[in-house]
Each structure stands twice: as C-alpha cells, then as structure tokens.
Amino acid sequence: MLPFFLFSPESPGQNLDRKISLDLNNSSLEETLVRLAELGNFRFSYNPGALPLDRPITYRCRKKPFRLVFDELFGSYGIEWLEVESQIVLKRSHSEGQSGNTVRAGPLPQHTVSGFLYDIKTGEALIGTHVMVRPLGKGTTTNEYGFYSLSLPEGMNEIAYSYMGFREEVRRVNILKDTLISVNLTETSLGMREVVIRARDNEQLPAVNQPGDFNFSGAVLERLPGFTGEVDVLKALQLLPGIRSFGDGSALYYVRGGNNDQNLLMIDEAPIYNPSHLFGFYSVLAPGAVNDMEIYKGDFPARYGGRASSVINITAREGNRKRFSMSGNVGPYASSLTLEGPIKKDEASFLISGRLSTLNWMNYLMDNTSSFNLYFFDINAKVNAKLSRKDRIYFTFFTGRDEFNRFTNSVYRTYGISWDNLASTFRWNHVFNPKLFSNTTLCFSSYDYNLFLSSDRKNYWRSSVGNFTLKSDLTWFLNPSNTLRGGFSVSRYHSNPGNITRQPGEEEEQIEVREVSQYTSMEYLIYLGNEQKIGKRLSLNYGIRLPVWQDFGPASLYYFDANHQVIDTVTVARNTSYATFFSPEPRVTVGVALNDISSLKASYSRTTQFLQLLSNATGPFTSLEVWAPAGPVIQPLKTDQVTLGYFLKFASSRFFLSAEGFYKYFRNHIDYADHANLLYNPLLEGELRFGTAWSYGLELMLQKPAGKLTGWIGYTWSRSWMETPGVNEGTAYPAGFDSPHNISIFLSYDTRKRWSFSANWIYMTGNPVTSPVGFYELNGSTVPLYGERNNDRLPDYHRLDLSVVYQLNKPGKRFRHNLSLTLYNAYGRANPFSVSFNKYEDAQGNFLVPSNLEGDYQLVPTTISVAGIIPSINYQFKF
C-alpha cells in the first residue's frame, strides 16, 4: 500500500518546540492529524492501512510544545513518530522498550503505578493529594496515609502531583512494569497558600465529590481566628453549613438536626467522647498536632459508622522526618509547645505536643467572696517508623484532663467537676502489592466524668465509658475507575452510667448510695464499599455495613409497664448475653457531572447507633455525662437520610458554589419524662421515652479559595422536630437544638508581606426553651405553669471574631515568629445560653432568689451569658 501524505499548503519547516493549546472531543485520528497539520504547518507521512484512523480521541492541553503533544497523543495508540527532513513519519511500533519517541504497538497492557506523597521539608504524608494522568484523563487521590495507586497503559505517561499550598510536580515516566513512585512536594510561600475547604476526593473531577463531606487542611485552620488566639478544630466546624454549636461555653455541636451524641470524633481512628476543654471554649486537640480533618455530614462511606449524624476523622501529624523542630504558642489563657524530629532520618520520627491552661491569675479580678480553681491540660504524642518499603507502623497517644472548682464564703459551696480523656492507637500499614493496601488498627479509648460530693474530694459521683477495638481495612485499587474497600472490626465497650465512689473509711455525709448496674457490650462488624466511575460523567459510591451488637452480664435488668413502673427484675450472670441486635446499613451515592464545572449528587444512607448519651440538661454547665447501650428497653437509634446537591465552579474556578438539601428520619429516638432524674438512679431507663424525630433543610456555601482576599459564606435553613407518645401530649415540638437560620462568614486578607487579617461572623436563631404560660398561687407560693414543650426561644445568637497577625521575621528565615491579637465576640454581644424563672427584681434593679416562696413575688425571667469581649495577645514561634 502506498504511503499517504497529509501536508499544509505551504509546507514550511517544522517547529516542534512551539507551544499550542488543543481541545479534542471524540475526534477521529484522521481529523486530529488534519488539525495538527493546520496548527503547526506540518507534513505527515503514514500508511493509512497501518493506523487506526477512525479511532476517537479525547485530549486537552494548554500551552504545550508540539513535541510533547505528539508523545502523549501518538504514544497512547502505539504509534511511533519520527522527524525526517521536512515531514513527520508515523508508523506502528513493533519493538518494546525502544528509546526516543516510540511506544509499544497493539492493545497496550496495563501496569500499576503506586507510591506515597510526602512534604519534602518534613517527610509528612500528604493526605488528599491529586494524582492526574492528563492525556488520559485519569486521576486519583492519596488516602489518609498518603498512598495512591493507578493502573496505566504501558509506555510514556505524564503524571502530575498537586496538593493545596504546594508546587505541582510533573513526572514523565516510561511505564514497562508495575512501578513504585513516591514523590516529595515542595511547599509554596505561606503567603500564597490557598484557603479552601475541599470537598472530598479530586476537586478537578466534580463527579467524584461526595455530598455533605468536607476536608479542613492545615492551611484553613491556620487562618481561622480561634478563641484566645489559638486555632481550634471545634470552632472551625461551626463555620460549615449544616453544623451548629450550642453557643458560648459549650463543646456541643449538632449536625443536620441530630443530637450532639450522634457525632463521632476520632483521632487516628480512636473515638473521643468529650472533645472539649474549658466547657467548650477549647478543643482537646492542640493545633500543632493536627494534620488533616475529614468531615462527613452526608452519607458516610461504609467503613464509618457507630453514630447517626456525622463522622469527623482527624489525622494527627507524624513528626518531622528530616530535622528537629520546635513550635509554641504563649498566651494569657493557655500555652502550648510542640517538639518533633527524626528518630532515624527519613525512616522514623516522633511528635509530642502539650498544652496547659494559665487561668488562675483571673482570681485577682474577682471579689473576695468567691474564688475558683480551673485548669486543663492535654498531651498528644505520635511515633512512626518505616519497617520496609511495604510496611510502616504508627503509635498515637492522647490524654487530657479538665477540672473546675468554685468556692464561696456563703453556706452554699460547690465542690466541682472534672473529666478525663485517654486514647491510644497502634496501626500497621502494609502494601501487599501495588493494587492492595491494608491497615490494621488496635485502639483504646476511655472517658471519665466526676462530680465531687465532699470538700476533700474523696467522695464523688462518677460515670465513664470506654472501648477496646481491633480492626482491619483493605483497599483494592482495581483500576483508576474502581476502588474496592472492605474490612472487619471487633470492639468491646464498657459503660458506667453513674455511681458514687468512696474512699475506704469515709463517713457517709448523709449521701444516699444506690448501686446502678454497669454495662458491658460487644460489637462485631464487617463492611464492603465500592467507589466507581462509569464513563466521564457518572460516579457511584455504594456499600453496606453489617454490625452486630451484644450485651453481656453481669447486670440487673428492670422491665417496665405502660405506666413506666417496674414489673420485673432479672439478674444476669457474668459473660451471659441478654440482648442482641443486627442492623444492616446500606449506603449509595450517585454523581453526575453536567459539564467540566458543575455536577449533581444524590445519596441515601442508613445508620445505626447502639451507644447513646443520656442527658436532659438545658445548659452547657449542667450536663451529667451518662452513656448507655442498646438493650431490652433502649432500642438502637436508626436514621435514614437522603440528600441532593449541586456543585459549581465559576469565574475560572475562582469561586466554588454548593447547594445541598437533606431529609433525615430517626426511629427509636430518646426523649425524657418531665423532670427526669438521671443522677445515680438504678431505674434510669424508666425515665426515658421513645419516639420519632425528623429534620430537613437547605445548605448553601460560596467559597473564594485563592488570592489576597479569601474566605467563604455559608447559610443553612433547617428544622428539627420530635414526636414522642406521652410527651407534650403526643404532639410534635421543635427539638432543643432546632435553629431555623444559621449564617457563617469567614474572610482572610493576606498582604503577602508581614500582616494578615481575618474575621468570622456567626448568626444562629436562638435555642428553643420551655417558658411558663402563667403563674398561680398555691398555699401562698407563686408557682409557674408550663404549657407546650419548647414553646419559646432564647434571643438570637451572633458573634464577631477578629484577628490580626504580624510576622516578626523576614521571609525565608528558619526561625519564624509572630504576634497575634484576637478579639472573641468583638462587639460584646451578650448571648444567653439559659433562662430561669425563679428570681424577682428588687427596687434597686437587682435580681434575687426569694429566701422563701411564701411572699408576694412577681417572678421574672433571667438569663445567663458568657462574658462579653474576650481579648488575647499571643506569641507564636517555630524553628
């Protein structure tokens, strides 16, 4: 067959180094050659019978030299190109592994490229790094350990590695077999780092973003104006649509109409039952120890469960594998110090971060009638070691403690409370082969809450909860469009719902002791999930989670009649099972990319929660922590959620817009009898009522991720309702955390020199409360009369936080330090968190509690709020 010549009219000389932009969409090879000949004034010579001229081609590039375009374009089809005098000769390649511009002919075999992504300065694994093969349109992201895997055709491939705040790294690799490629990325200047809350998965491929799921990187957390000048993980959550806090002085947060105990927060896979310090003003996570934070408030991947509303997975930093480093934050309310460095360079490292409160100086500002002792501390530590190219181990340890005691000179004296968190995790990563990755975890977590009942602190009411878990997770990268995840876990839980602890020989002090049964439970779990892309527009993420829950003795079980009176008592022997639950949890997400900048998502998920927090407190300082498992009386909480989302990038990807609607339905939802007694009550379950709940809402978010001015605006409209037989006359009423309108605004301005400024503003509809509908006289006393539950609301909550940071060092210096000024609640808004109706106002305008109720008092509502403006000046350093 005679050769075929395709040439331009003028047939000038070649210019293979000239750059072009090209956009081909299902063009045939023949049409592509015509286009290239016109663009570059090229003459192509080839045998038409030897080339797949009808094969469709989709290819995009921007400002690439013709030489590289030919490599990528022709190499994908096993075509060899050669420059011979004034023409480009094309022919099928018949040799393997040739140098130059040749690629293997025929149907190309697939090979797997896998490896890890690291920060070149610290050796820290980079989570969520984008790995893209641009000519093929294939891509993936690194997992929580920085690992990735891609199947690519044999031959020359261009792989781009990109991570927010780091320079892109591009590798041209001739793939002839399964290949391990680990890459170190270089951080850009801090002034240029983007501030963006990434939707999970690859932001270059909208079709794989999960509805309701977000990720906070370190770049985001660094710029948020945290309480008293310190970055705070829990405060950052309040800025996301669909997540709201209780208010000041509380660590409680609520996700899409779920209660606060329906949120699972983990540090390196170990659950933290109370993630707060100082009644929620600080989180238990020192910012120097946080590497990455995933937030799932939509459908959870099948590997996550145990809670009904959200999962927050925090990955602790691993420590600098290159050199020793120290950083710290010195402030008026708390100070922290972080040490990290290599144990063996590039092979093993450590990190230890500690924080201690410095609050006792505030006693000098108080009057002589009262004083308090309030302190907290926490320690985060992590060690990791590379055993081989395929094995790495991690050990994480966390402990934290809070204590609050207030003493007065009056007859009334409060002895105080304390709470402790302890968690540790041992993990082993193993790469079986380039497509199969495993992680095995052994973790322990416990939480204790103490209410002191005597001045010597030897008698106290104590509740606790803890778990011990063994789990294994496997990830099988079948191909770039299909990833299979599966695993199992076995967990043992122990819960003490509240008993009095005494030291030997102590007097009774007129405190009645009633033994409350403790709980022991086991959970067995297997799960399987699949992340799949079908074509260029459709993505699926589906799976199933199969948990089994069992309760074991010893225990004393109480059974109640319809009037909640005890009708039977059963004593269960040790290690005897008395309740078993099995609850399959299907999850599915479907995504459709409408075009290159917009996509739609829909999801359905079922979650089951076997362990629940019992509390009828209405304020943040009165909560008694009681955790109880599902059993003969308490049924597992089951939640079904559907979501629909729309995602858009516009203005050349300078702005991101998301809109999501959701509906959740809760079965076996716990409610409480009026004036329920949960304090060392052996008949605790008789105070509970069970019904249904539902929530629905719309969440909007607009982000500007890059430039000197960055930030986002979030708005949520939502409602949360409860309906329980025997409560509120069986009619529906708003949940205690129902808040129809929530607005969050965050702005950050970086001068790219030494100054940076940030601000956030939060607005929430006031929390529902139950107010008296009238008062009546009984035996000379004024008694409030209550109507429907949650028939009123506190005033709306809003707060402005401001922060300014001045960099003391010149750019490029190893020793970096700065001063920051933060104003929490900058305009001094008094945001009430509780209201009471037991006081009257005297002639001088003072609010007093009547010494006796046999008087003509006009009771008035009074509220309690946290102090107004809270300023802080902090000094931060790092070297």
Task: Write out the residue ranges for each language-model feature.
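Periplasmic N-terminal accessory/gating domains of Gram-negative outer-membrane beta-barrel systems
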Residues: 138, 165-167, 194-300, 311, ...
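Surface-exposed extracellular loop regions of Gram-negative outer-membrane beta-barrel proteins
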Residues: 448, 494-508, 512, 550-564, ...
